[in-house]
């Protein structure tokens, strides 16, 4: 890689440090890569959540919608944050750059949707340290005259790949 970014959260930044130690590249913290804020559920196991917030737990369990959880980051805000992260990474780099970013399993769904240019979130069990590898033409990303259906400009090389753990 030519550039390394990481969520500033401890576990992720430590993973980034370990994974890139041999390259000795600086790791740039990028706040927009942090995990989603689950509000009052933070730091609690499911039994504690159910005991302390039974109605919010029931609504979340039925809908899987974090907007029912007090103080949780709203879904719309997560989408905006993910789009901001993708747009920043694209705007700050050229096609010659190779970017490595370390993030979390919750926000990655929003990052993936933003990168794919879709409004729908796809459920995907993301493995710890799973790799997602994309090639994209950053210089033509925001141009309206770019052929969006041109498969050599945007390519998925790896998606949720944990084979390095085998």
Question: Model segments located where?
Answer:
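Acidic, low-complexity terminal tails and accessory targeting/binding regions
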Residues: 25, 36-48, 91, 95-97, ...
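Generic beta-sheet signal
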Residues: 2, 97-103
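Short glycine/proline- and acidic residue-enriched helix-loop micro-motifs
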Residues: 56-77
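Generic structural signal for well-ordered alpha-helical scaffold segments
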Residues: 79, 83-91, 112
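GST superfamily/GST-like fold recognition
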Residues: 105-109, 130
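Phosphate-coordination/substrate-recognition cap region in phosphate-metabolizing enzymes
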Residues: 1-58
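Active-site signature of alpha/beta-hydrolase-fold catalytic machinery across serine-
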Residues: 18, 110-114
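Short beta-strand scaffold positions
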Residues: 6-7, 80, 102-103
């Amino acid at each position: 890689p030519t550039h390394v970014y990481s969520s500033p959260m401890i576990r992720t930044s430590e993973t980034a440090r370990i994974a890139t130690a041999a390259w000795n590249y600086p790791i740039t913290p990028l706040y927009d890569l942090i995990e989603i804020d689950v509000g009052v559920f933070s730091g609690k196991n499911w039994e504690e959540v159910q005991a302390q917030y039974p109605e919010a737990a029931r609504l979340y369990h039925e809908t899987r919608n974090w907007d029912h959880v007090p103080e949780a980051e709203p879904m719309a805000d997560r989408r905006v944050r993910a789009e901001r992260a993708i747009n920043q990474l694209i705007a700050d780099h050229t096609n010659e750059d190779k970017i490595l970013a370390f993030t979390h399993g919750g926000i990655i769904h929003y990052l993936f949707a933003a990168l794919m240019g879709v409004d729908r979130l796809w459920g995907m069990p993301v493995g710890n340290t799973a790799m997602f590898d994309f090639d994209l033409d950053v210089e033509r990303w925001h141009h309206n005259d770019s052929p969006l259906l041109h498969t050599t400009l945007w390519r998925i090389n790896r998606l949720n790949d944990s084979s390095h753990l085998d």
